[in-house]
């Protein structure tokens, strides 16, 4: 307690309090909810703790995720299980070269019987949307989805329809099969708050997956419906609001901006992160803080967020790419070169 002002003492690292900021008590409750969701997902998605944390942080931040991983690593399973934890609707689109924008958003159809136009909603009208192999559809179809992601609404024949929140797109890419694909342009990649890499699990986790799947003769895979629903969609919306109101002091904001500016000035980088990259760093930093039960962002939150937030926003110069330089190593080196503030 501050004796001169008769106000509660401020937490170290937190900004001065205001009515619109998340309180430590609210952060603690939200962190408990996150732990429940995290625990349920870990029951059916083994050995991928970091992936689960990153996807959950993106949901709290109200962002969309680009998932990259080889086939058979459980991307669909993860998204369906996440939807089940809060009773949300799940939708899936398999992107193919012949997929049309109306296959994504929906269309109007004239009903001969009633002599009226009927609205047919597309699969984007859901809470969690899995856009499988998004880079296999042509640019026009990709753009239709990315517009929905940005605007949170669909326009069909001049009629604008709002999506029911929460809405999150998780788009997948296969890093191996690139033949016949349409790479996402940089401006569209920038719409994803994170690029999450799903790798093979460790041996113990892989043995557990194989053991569970082969326990029953009729089993075709892990059961994403085995997770328990621990909250409602409105609880996710409340957590997103509290996440947005987590405190980020000017020094932490400056740190995020400095990291992004450093990517633009670094030798060997042909394209650095833009302002949206710094915004995403703060948004994910707030999510990490909330998941930890804190009402303020620390420099460590920003540093932890930097790799998944920036890896798809930064491009190596051709000579480094040809030599086999890894983009993750380049980003990590840049982040480590930027001095973190002491707050």
Please provide the spans of the model-predicted regions:
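Conserved beta-strand position immediately N-terminal to the Walker
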Residues: 65, 129, 167
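Conserved alpha-helical scaffold flanking the Walker A/P-loop in AAA+ ATPase domains
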Residues: 54-57, 110-130
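Walker B catalytic acidic pair
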Residues: 69, 132-133, 144
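Pre-Walker A (pre-P-loop) alpha-helix and adjacent loop at the N terminus of AAA/AAA+ ATPase modules
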Residues: 27-70
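C-terminal engagement/docking regions of AAA+ P-loop ATPases
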Residues: 2-3, 13-23, 28, 263-343
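Walker A/P-loop
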Residues: 59-96
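Canonical AAA+ ATPase core
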Residues: 111-116, 137, 141, 149-246, ...
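P-loop (Walker A) phosphate-binding loop of NTP-binding proteins
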Residues: 70, 104, 172
């Amino acid at each position: 307690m501050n004796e001169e002002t008769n106000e509660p003492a401020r937490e170290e690292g937190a900004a001065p309090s205001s009515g619109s900021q998340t309180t430590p008590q609210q952060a603690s409750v939200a962190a408990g909810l996150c732990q429940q969701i995290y625990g349920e997902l870990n029951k059916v998605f083994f050995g991928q703790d970091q992936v689960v944390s990153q996807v959950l942080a993106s949901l709290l931040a109200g962002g969309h995720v680009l998932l990259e991983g080889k086939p058979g690593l459980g991307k669909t399973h993860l998204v369906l299980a996440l939807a089940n934890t809060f009773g949300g609707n799940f939708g899936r689109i398999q992107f193919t070269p012949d997929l049309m924008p109306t296959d994504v958003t929906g269309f109007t159809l004239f009903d001969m019987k009633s002599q009226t136009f009927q609205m047919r909603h597309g699969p984007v009208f859901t809470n969690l949307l899995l856009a499988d192999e998004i880079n296999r559809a042509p640019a026009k179809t990709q753009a239709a989805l990315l517009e929905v992601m940005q605007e949170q609404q669909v326009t069909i024949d001049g009629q604008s329809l709002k999506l029911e929140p929460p809405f999150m797109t998780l788009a997948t890419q296969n890093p191996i099969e690139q033949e016949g694909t349409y790479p996402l342009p940089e401006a569209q990649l920038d719409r994803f708050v994170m690029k999450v890499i799903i790798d093979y699990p460790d041996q113990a986790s892989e043995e557990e997956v194989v053991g569970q799947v082969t326990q029953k003769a009729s089993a075709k895979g892990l059961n994403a419906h085995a997770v328990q629903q621990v909250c409602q969609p409105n609880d996710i919306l409340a957590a997103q609001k509290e996440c947005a109101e987590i405190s980020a002091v000017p020094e932490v904001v400056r740190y995020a901006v400095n990291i992004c500016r450093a990517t633009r000035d670094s030798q060997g980088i042909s394209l650095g992160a833009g302002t949206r990259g710094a915004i995403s760093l703060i948004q994910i930093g707030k999510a990490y803080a909330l998941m930890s039960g804190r009402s303020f962002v620390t420099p460590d939150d920003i540093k932890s967020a930097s790799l998944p937030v920036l890896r798809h926003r930064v491009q190596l110069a051709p000579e480094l790419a040809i030599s086999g330089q890894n983009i993750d190593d380049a980003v990590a080196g840049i982040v480590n070169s930027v001095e973190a503030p002491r707050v």
